[in-house]
Amino acid sequence: FQTSTFVFKTAEEGKRFFEVAYGKDSLKKHEQIGLIYSRINNPNMQILEERLAVLEDSEEAAAFESGMSAISTTMLAYLKPGDVILYSKPTYGGTHHFINNFLAEIGVASIGFNHNTELQEIWEELESKKLTSKVKMLYIETPANPTNSLIDLSIIKQLKEKIQQIHNHEIVAVVDNTYLGPIWQKPLAFGADLVCYSATKFLNGHSDVIAGAVMGSHDNILPIKTLRTFLGSMIAPYTAWLLTRSLETLHIRMNQQEKNAKKIVEFLTQHPKVKNVFYPGLSSMGQKQLDIYQSQCFSGGAMIGFTIEESEASAFKLLNSLKLIKLAVSLGSNESLAQHPYSMTHTDVPDEEKKAIGISEGLIRLSVGIENYNDLIEDLSQALD
């Protein structure tokens, strides 16, 4: 439906559509949002959102023109100057920049924590800075990009209950599920209010679309959709159609990527030149990480981190030697992609912070595609030799 505007049957119908769209009145039972203008909604977007909600087991979904527009609109819908956001580290470089630069500039404070941080430590830091009453959002990315470290989603209910009990206010818990969802992890089941995605990645899987999505209950999605209307960040009709088509093969693609990833992890862990392999479910990630994996993940997914030596030179040498695997950012596509997070996707994160949260100069991030795994292993083998 490549159109900018829609014809009303009557003037009364047009009036009613606008009343609902601008929040002057709520939808009645069995009433649907009317088609007005493609900045507000369009059939392709509505079909996509309905399917995304089914995949996530949520009431509603909101589709966006990019993953960052989904994340930033969600944060802006729920945060105002004086509020505090708690967020897990590491997180996607764009998210890190938005939190630590844009939100900071408008007066939203932030407290970061990593996978080793206990809830009590987070609480003590908040209390020491007198910020517990100001926390309005908990933002978690798990597995973390690019280290694959897992954040225990049980922290969501614990923190929400503690703040509700002491300060009698609700916080919004948001989980970036791009790495594992919607097949291999279900954050809503652990108390998350909203789940966000860069739909560019696994959801689309063809490296030909930029898109984002947020899923949750009707009440939690409503302020996000309202703000989306005025920011103009909704997904375009043709992009929505492409993404809807891609969802038809989602399970086939992701399951094949997972099978390939497990074969590659097995190869890398046994290769004498590979120092570390980071993949959810590996015992080498530590018992605590293994326990979290077993409690909330259905699979380790198709993202792998590994190091040869802790140097940029060693990482660049391997990346420049790859023949089949493409040297490019992004992830979750049919083709395998490899990149250097320290100098590329996470270049904006201060060097000291990168090292503290496990993003070393030698770390390579590999997004595994649907190629024959023997071909991928052969490519990695020749690049390592």
Show where each model-derived region lies.
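Conserved C-terminal alpha-helix-loop-beta "cap" of PLP-dependent enzymes
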Residues: 274-364, 368, 376
